[in-house]
């Protein structure tokens, strides 16, 4: 994992969602821990992190339906990192107003994890 000061919002969200969706951790515990760890971030950034994590989890079934409508490989068969990146990005595109449809940080997060 990168140094905390170098992590972007989306990398923090990705790590949190991996813990919750792929490792089965409780969302409220993961989010509490993450928000305490990054309490130095501005409130707007912490709100974005929390809203994106909670929204992705709450809309997971619909998001998976949308992804499965377009993807050759269905979500249950995807690698966990790819599945989580797609869920996070799909949530942002469908539900958040002020997020660009294509975000460089998604690519960067994927590149840093190989």
PLM-predicted stretches and their roles:
Residues 3-29:
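Long, amphipathic alpha-helical "stalk/connector" segments that mediate intersubunit docking
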């Amino acid at each position: 994992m990168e140094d905390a000061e170098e992590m972007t919002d989306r990398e923090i969200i990705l790590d949190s969602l991996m813990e919750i969706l792929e490792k089965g951790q409780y969302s409220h515990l993961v989010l509490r821990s993450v928000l305490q760890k990054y309490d130095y971030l501005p409130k707007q950034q912490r709100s974005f992190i929390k809203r994106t994590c909670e929204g992705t989890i709450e809309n997971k079934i619909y998001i998976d339906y949308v992804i499965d409508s377009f993807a050759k490989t269905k979500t249950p068969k995807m690698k966990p990192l790819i599945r989580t990146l797609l869920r996070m990005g799909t949530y942002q595109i469908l539900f958040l107003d002020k997020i660009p449809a294509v975000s460089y940080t998604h690519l960067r997060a994927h590149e840093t994890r190989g």
